[in-house]
């Protein structure tokens, strides 16, 4: 059925499968979350805040994300040289997706999310029409 649908519309692959392939590797969404929500830009920041990620895996994921066009690697000419990562327009499109993932958990997994286990509306917790990054800024 899916194959027929793809063929009908001249598609080579399912766009959802393609997106899952792009961000579905372990820690990729965590890196995007930290870039979008925490405004993190440096390797050491990711390494210190993503539980369980190794330097090797982080390096691999950042390279993959750069190849996918989600981030750009910027070399800052200081001594010592610093590397920062920036979201591309493509990478920035994940903010509403992350917000939807947050809404899902707040609504359907309150026992895991909240100490009292009571469901809440996402906007009641994080505010309406507020970019998530403003909630997470230090």
Task: Give residue ranges: language-model regions.
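C-terminal regulatory/oligomerization modules of transcriptional regulators
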Residues: 1-11, 72, 89-90, 95-138
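Basic amphipathic alpha-helical segments that dock to polyanions
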Residues: 58, 62-65
């Amino acid at each position: 059925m899916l194959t027929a649908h793809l063929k009908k519309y001249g598609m080579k692959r399912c766009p959802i499968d393609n997106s899952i392939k792009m961000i579905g590797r372990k820690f990729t969404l965590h890196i995007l979350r930290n870039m979008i929500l925490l405004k993190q830009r440096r390797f050491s920041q990711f390494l210190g805040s993503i539980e369980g990620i190794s330097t090797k895996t982080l390096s691999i994921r950042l390279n993959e994300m750069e190849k996918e066009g989600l981030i750009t690697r910027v070399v800052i000419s200081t001594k010592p040289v610093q590397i920062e990562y920036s979201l591309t327009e493509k990478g920035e499109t994940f903010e509403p997706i992350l917000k939807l993932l947050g809404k899902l958990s707040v609504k359907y997994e309150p026992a895991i999310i909240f100490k009292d286990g009571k469901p809440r509306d996402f906007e009641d917790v994080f505010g309406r029409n507020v970019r998530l990054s403003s909630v997470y800024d230090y």
